[in-house]
Amino acid sequence: MPQKYYQSPRWSNEIADCSMPMTFDTYSNCSFGCLYCFSQFQRGIGNPKETYLHKDVRGVSVDRVKKMFTDPDKYGGQFAEYIKQRKVMQWGGLSDQFDGFERTRGVTLELLRFFKEINYPLCFSTKATWFTKDDRYMDLIRGQRNWNFKFSIITLDEQKAHIIEKGVPSPKERLDALERIANADAGGATLRLRPFIIGVSTPTYLDLIREAASRGATAMSTEFFCVEQRSPTLKAFMPTFNELCGFDVMAFYRKYSISSGYLRLNRKVKEPFFKNMKALCEEVGMRFYVSDAHFKELCCNGSCCGLPSSWNYSRGQWCEALQIAKEKEFVYWPDIKDDIEKLVGGFEWIRAIGFNTNSSEKKAKFDTMTMADYMRWLWNNPQAGQSPYKLFEGILLPVGKDENEDLIYKYNGHK
């Protein structure tokens, strides 16, 4: 029997490297149809495939969410400590909370009223624009200085955007919305130039950054497009990508990636683009952040989604460790362990809500660990894919152990 309500929040699968690992979605589906959407690849396989592809949708239970945040000790479960510590919650991970479903159902609006009442810090990720012209929403947003809004825009090319981002307002409309938020005296507007796609983003990316800055964006976050070559959904979209990019995208990624399966372009390909972005952000007065594992050391601080260092995000993650090492040359486990132990030390890895624990090998290895134990294991096993060493491809180097046998990492990148 299908569940009446969608179950959210969940833990991000990038928990080891995420400043907002508690991520929330209003709906089980998204009315937008972006060809690059990783959620589409993730949800469009296995048992949920039919309901996702047919755009069947369920919303969260507003009453359940209110109980979680009103009495976290009783109703918060694994998220109780995160809520009690009032860490920033990421809203909009797998779906857009301001999409067409919200326009007809209004579940996000109900929750916004509640979160404003309790003054809870939030970071939104969206491509929608209509809510910035709706007084019901803007009356709640105005003056709410602990609500930050990220607007995803990957190109100024209206035609390419229309083809790739089906059902999404034009880049200009999104810039207009960003400007309305920037002028609302809230927690800031951020340009989310993700995913950055060579051939689609490259012709206009510097103009896009300048335009966002002129509209009031105070930060930008970026990440290169990754190709999941095992995804049948993405394979079906490849002819469209090839036409828009002007080259064989899959062949390009296979040639310039060092991995197989999930293809990420190598550092040399990305370097000139990231350096151009950072230089321009410094010129126009925007903070710069890289969510990509490559060149994350260029971030202004330890929240790669673009939150300033004054915000109450989790410091228990590798991006923070990278910033510490960049400043002090070395970083130690005790430098980041407090938030890890407080926020994710109270539940077992195997039971982490929304986290990928399906691998039999991982189950056997981590079955008895808490999530905090798992993160410490990653820290101390540099050959693991999510270790600081492997994730950043040697920018953090293990150089020894402390008195507790935890690895010490040294910064190995540009200052």
Kindly give the residue locations of the regions a language model identified.
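Conserved Radical SAM active-site core
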Residues: 1-148, 156-158, 180, 367-415
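A broad, structural surface signal
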Residues: 32-35, 39, 113, 210, ...
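C-terminal accessory extensions appended to soluble enzyme cores
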Residues: 235-415
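Conserved AdoMet/S-adenosylmethionine-binding subsite of the radical SAM
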Residues: 66-269
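Functionally constrained cores in energy, signaling, and assembly domains
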Residues: 17, 26, 174, 187-189, ...
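A generic membrane alpha-helix/interface feature
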Residues: 49-51, 212, 234, 303
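Generic serine detector
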Residues: 8, 12, 19, 28-31, ...
